[in-house]
Amino acid sequence: MSRVGKKPVTVPSGVTATVEGQTVKMKGPKGQLQFVVHDDVDVKFEDGSVKVAPRFETNRAQALYGTARAQIANLVDGVTKGFEKKLEITGVGYRASLQGKKLQLALGYSHDVIYDIPEGITITVPKPTEINVVGIDSQKVGQVAAEIRDYRPPEPYKGKGVRYSDEFIFRKEGKKK
């Protein structure tokens, strides 16, 4: 049994939760999100909290219901607080700038990389070497941050590239003569 899945997800005041079949909808001050739970997982909304339980005693159902509970908890966090990922750009001449709904990245290529910002995501550039990705959907925020990082992942010799602000880059020594 999943320890995570056993705990009910408490819905704070100011957030309305509805369960329609296998769809869980959350509406809060930051917006509205929904999540479709797998058929092997049973979802109930009672006493101001969402409870998740496996429908069958299979290994698959046991694995999925802890995941479903975590996803529903992310919905509550998203509509109340939101999610944020911070990226740092390291390297000579590497910088970022916003141009309307597009993020322009100068990452050492012969051309600038233009990234279209998807709906529901807000990107701010407080400094030319910092990017903040903010949104209510944790998966979307993480996906956008990962896509931006993939344009120039940090390399281990000089540490140049785009990295998460809390990421540690294992540095290597160069060749010795």
Swiss-Prot record:
<protein>
    <recommendedName>
        <fullName>Large ribosomal subunit protein uL6</fullName>
    </recommendedName>
</protein>
<keyword id="KW-0699">rRNA-binding</keyword>
<dbReference type="InterPro" id="IPR019906">
    <property type="entry name" value="Ribosomal_uL6_bac-type"/>
</dbReference>
<dbReference type="InterPro" id="IPR020040">
    <property type="entry name" value="Ribosomal_uL6_a/b-dom"/>
</dbReference>
<dbReference type="GO" id="GO:0003735">
    <property type="term" value="F:structural constituent of ribosome"/>
</dbReference>
<dbReference type="GO" id="GO:0022625">
    <property type="term" value="C:cytosolic large ribosomal subunit"/>
</dbReference>
<comment type="function">
    <text>This protein binds to the 23S rRNA, and is important in its secondary structure. It is located near the subunit interface in the base of the L7/L12 stalk, and near the tRNA binding site of the peptidyltransferase center.</text>
</comment>
<comment type="similarity">
    <text>Belongs to the universal ribosomal protein uL6 family.</text>
</comment>
<dbReference type="Pfam" id="PF00347">
    <property type="entry name" value="Ribosomal_L6"/>
</dbReference>
<dbReference type="GO" id="GO:0002181">
    <property type="term" value="P:cytoplasmic translation"/>
</dbReference>
<dbReference type="GO" id="GO:0019843">
    <property type="term" value="F:rRNA binding"/>
</dbReference>
<dbReference type="InterPro" id="IPR002358">
    <property type="entry name" value="Ribosomal_uL6_CS"/>
</dbReference>
<dbReference type="InterPro" id="IPR036789">
    <property type="entry name" value="Ribosomal_uL6-like_a/b-dom_sf"/>
</dbReference>
<comment type="subunit">
    <text>Part of the 50S ribosomal subunit.</text>
</comment>
<dbReference type="InterPro" id="IPR000702">
    <property type="entry name" value="Ribosomal_uL6-like"/>
</dbReference>
<keyword id="KW-0694">RNA-binding</keyword>
<keyword id="KW-0689">Ribosomal protein</keyword>
<keyword id="KW-0687">Ribonucleoprotein</keyword>
